[in-house]
């Protein structure tokens, strides 16, 4: 089964933890993993390939975070002009064979419970019979932020957009209403045929768009020009509301849509809870993501406080969602705070801003294994690099040399330079830039005659082939069981399976 992950959200709802350049689906939320990574981990037992649909500007973040999965088969579908879930799901599904099962999930949900497996297995049974299947969640409370569906047993009667529940007295939990989780399971051909019959415009424009793109490694880019004729809208509005005989599986697992900061746990990976002190507070939530700051609250109630290195958000819990309007109304003046955070992903690694003031800027630079910066130079600043982790292969002018931990190098203004990582571990450098102008635009890339100026130029060949390390891809901790065959679908003639080992040719495999 293939898994299409929708990961194109903009990040306003969780400000200041998430920003436009680093939205919530990429934040470390649980056990050091982001919501995107948690979504992948959750579905690895059921899916053999992942198709991640996201904005073009998030390409480097996705590829950077997917390096955590060294033997995983995945593809990134980039939307130059996002048009809603209908286009995203159609474009992603076109990369699957028509007979293959496709499981659509979103990258901003938290899910717990063994019942997740049961829901997927039941949905697969229905999908194999030709149905498009939604996963519905029994409402725990009235919530105007979610879409609903009305069902009769496993039959979907209608989809309902987000509604003002206080204004709709006819709504009742006993009437067969379920939250629409945004998760769907179907055979690729069944969805494509439904689109052709119900919304020919969506079918035709998505099919033409796919014909116009070229795959580079595992990345497919649909430019704004290619996507301009694709209709805007949700998959529910354009297809599912008009679909006959759609099925739904009511789920019993714990499901949480991370819609605002109140949906987070104060003790999650995003917060340093040891640096929070509450005194005489009632129903107060404090999330402190700044590891060098103490947050103290005193004699307040029904309030949420979110503290980061460069911004603080304080709101009543009732009005916490107002942040979207606040950002929209004040974006021009405070764009740097609303849109950007201190971490930025590149094709070759990560930049993290540590400190900045007039005349200097300090960054932590991480270069991924087997990656290299482009050769470049700066006209307005000099740089001082200190290697604090790994072995960096640094080019200065015409000279290339390896620098080890605790060794440093000075890069004068105008000097051509780059860093490459020819090892199988991250290289970490502390970079200090000095100059009157420290803009990211002060960079002149220098390509070789053989270069085509694409991200492919950022790959280097390792000096030594790394040792291949293998671990069980699937493991049944209860030795003597049949879980690997009955649950994960492993093909094996033995009655008892303890471990299953998989060999991968994935370029990041170890």
Task: Label each region the model flagged.
Residues 36, 92, 108, 149, ...:
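Residue-level signal for inorganic ion chemistry
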Residues 58, 109, 190-191, 263, ...:
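Short, well-ordered alpha-helical scaffold segment located
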Residues 1-5, 13-20, 28-104, 110-112, ...:
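Conserved N-terminal catalytic core of the sugar/cofactor nucleotidyltransferase
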Residues 113-217, 221-227, 247:
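Conserved core of the sugar-phosphate nucleotidyltransferase
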Residues 6, 105, 387, 432:
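Catalytic metal- and UDP-sugar-binding loop of GT-A-like glycosyltransferases, i.e.
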